[in-house]
Structures are given as structure tokens and as C-alpha cells.
């Protein structure tokens, strides 16, 4: 897993104490994030993607409880899928978080010219281009790869469309499997028709463009969505039950426990399908035996044994 480099800050002499304290806090925050990145670095994205393929939110939540993470990582129910297809299950996804935070701008909300006059259109065009290229761009795009979940903290954006139907398709083309956002999604009819997997708070959808409204604050740093802190590299699982975040440091064991629960549940439901004469569907296709699956991927055959 590649993490962005962290800035080195030097305490300068003859500075006000408040300034030095602020730098000290910043160093502490950077050190904490760097420590987390080192802690997580030994876990392969590829193995995690295989482990969580087809995972259900409920099984993952049970896995978190098993390792002592009660009520950790479960996003507020308001973060929900914009659409569902329980025949194909295309609304469901699991993947690795790439994080971005947008915030309200503190710059002038317009270029200063009278935009009601056609002769000022070029002023508007240049101002718009500057905003999208410099202030509210998508620098997180370089981190998107196969299995990425874009996690967007834009909870203070008000009525701003931080993303829409075209942006999401661009990310999918790069390999993203879905978007989890605090809000700020627009072009919703097209998003639904295109079946772009998006989980967001529908009541906080945004309609205005980003220009003059928001800026990129952070990329690949911890963000908060749905009441949960998400670090870059965490595992995200989303289905009709909502969204769960698995901290990278426990992702392997939680994933193994969730896989075992899924296998047990599928076997039990398949038996009931047979007893009641119900036709089998994809939800009762039993996954590979856990021990065999784990061994194939170099994982402990039983995650609950030392």
C-alpha cells in the first residue's frame, strides 16, 4: 500500500508560544497518521479484496464485535444506497478506501465582474477553469485503482454537487468499485440509470457546481463520513444494510470471521431452500471452504486460534 509522504515541520526560535504549540499539535497528528500507515503496510490490498469479495455488512459487523470493536465502523443509516438491484446485487461492493475531503471556500464567490453581461463571459470561463484546476480539482484520482472505494467527506458543503454522473464514471473507468459520500451528489437520475454504486445521505444531495463553493482540503488523510473515521487503506463494505468501515489493522481477522459466517449462513439458508422447495438463487451459492480459501491466500486456517 502506498501512502503519501508526511510533511516534516521544524520548530523555529523566537516564535510566539501559541505558534509553537500549534506546530507541536500538527507534528503529533502527522506522527500518529504515519504510525498508522506503518502499522498497516504489511497487509496486501489484493488479499483483502479477495477476502472481502461478496462480504455482507452484517457478517463484517459481527466480525468486528468478535475482535472487540463494538459499535465501531458502522456508518449512520442515513448513508444508504441511491438504488438497489436485489436480482443482480450490483449495488453492493467492497474495496479499499481512497479518501478526500472537500470544504466550503473562504474566497470570493464570484469573479467580480457583472456576469449578466455577455461581454464578461470570458472572465467567467477563466475563473471557472482556475477553480476546477487549482482549488476544487480531483487530486485523489491518482490513487484510484482496481478495487478502490472513493470515500468523500463533504458534510459541510451545503448545496454543492461535489460529484456527479460523469465524475463517478471516470473513477469507475480507473477501477473504482463505488462511492461513499456524506452528501453532495448530483445528477442522481443518471447515477441511478447508469447503476453507479453510490452510498450517500440523499437528503444532503448537492445541486450547485463546486466553483465558488468548495475547495479540496485533504487527500489520502483521515476523513469522517456517517459518524465514522475512515483512514486511507481501510476496508469498506456496502450493501442494503448500509456501510461498514474495517480498520486496516484488524481487516484480515475480521474478514476471515465474516467469510466463515457467510459460509455458515449460506449453507443453512440453502438447506431451508431445499426443505421448503424454493428455487435456488445466487444468495445460496456456497462459497469455497474457509480453511481451503484461507490457505490458498496465505492466511491462518482458523483466525480464532493462536
Kindly give the residue locations of the regions a language model identified.
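Boundary at the C-terminal end of the N-terminal hydrophobic targeting segment
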Residues: 35-37
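Long terminal accessory segments
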Residues: 41-44, 55, 254-306
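Acidic, glycine-rich flexible loop/linker segments
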Residues: 203-283
Amino acid at each position: 500500500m502506498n501512502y503519501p509522504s508526511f510533511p516534516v515541520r521544524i520548530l523555529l526560535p523566537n516564535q510566539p508560544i501559541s505558534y509553537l504549540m500549534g506546530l507541536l499539535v500538527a507534528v503529533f497528528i502527522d506522527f500518529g497518521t504515519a504510525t498508522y500507515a506503518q502499522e498497516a503496510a504489511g497487509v496486501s490490498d489484493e488479499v483483502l479484496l479477495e477476502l472481502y469479495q461478496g462480504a455482507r455488512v452484517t457478517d463484517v459487523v459481527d466480525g468486528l464485535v468478535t475482535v472487540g470493536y463494538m459499535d465501531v465502523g458502522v456508518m449512520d443509516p442515513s448513508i444508504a444506497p441511491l438504488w438497489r438491484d436485489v436480482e443482480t446485487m450490483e449495488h453492493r461492493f467492497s474495496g479499499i478506501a481512497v479518501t478526500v475531503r472537500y470544504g466550503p471556500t473562504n474566497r470570493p464567490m464570484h469573479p467580480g465582474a457583472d456576469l449578466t453581461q455577455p461581454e464578461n463571459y470570458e472572465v467567467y470561463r477563466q475563473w471557472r477553469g482556475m477553480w476546477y484546476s487549482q482549488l476544487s480539482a480531483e487530486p485523489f484520482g491518482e490513487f484510484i485503482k482496481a478495487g478502490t472505494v472513493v470515500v468523500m467527506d463533504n458534510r459541510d458543503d451545503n448545496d454543492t454537487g461535489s460529484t456527479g454522473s460523469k465524475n463517478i464514471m471516470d473513477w469507475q473507468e480507473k477501477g473504482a468499485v463505488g462511492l461513499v459520500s456524506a452528501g453532495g451528489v448530483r445528477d442522481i437520475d443518471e447515477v441511478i440509470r447508469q447503476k453507479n454504486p453510490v452510498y450517500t445521505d440523499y437528503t444532503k444531495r448537492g445541486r450547485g457546481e463546486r466553483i465558488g463553493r468548495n475547495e479540496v482540503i485533504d487527500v489520502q488523510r483521515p476523513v469522517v463520513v456517517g459518524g465514522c473515521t475512515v483512514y486511507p487503506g481501510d476496508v469498506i463494505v456496502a450493501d442494503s444494510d448500509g456501510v461498514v468501515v474495517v480498520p486496516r489493522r484488524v481487516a484480515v481477522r475480521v474478514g476471515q470471521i465474516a467469510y466463515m459466517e457467510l459460509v455458515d449462513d449460506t449453507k443453512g439458508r440453502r438447506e431451508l431452500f431445499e426443505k421448503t422447495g424454493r428455487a435456488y438463487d445466487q444468495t445460496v451459492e456456497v462459497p469455497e471452504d474457509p480453511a481451503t480459501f484461507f490457505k490458498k491466500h496465505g492466511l491462518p486456517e482458523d483466525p480464532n486460534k493462536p
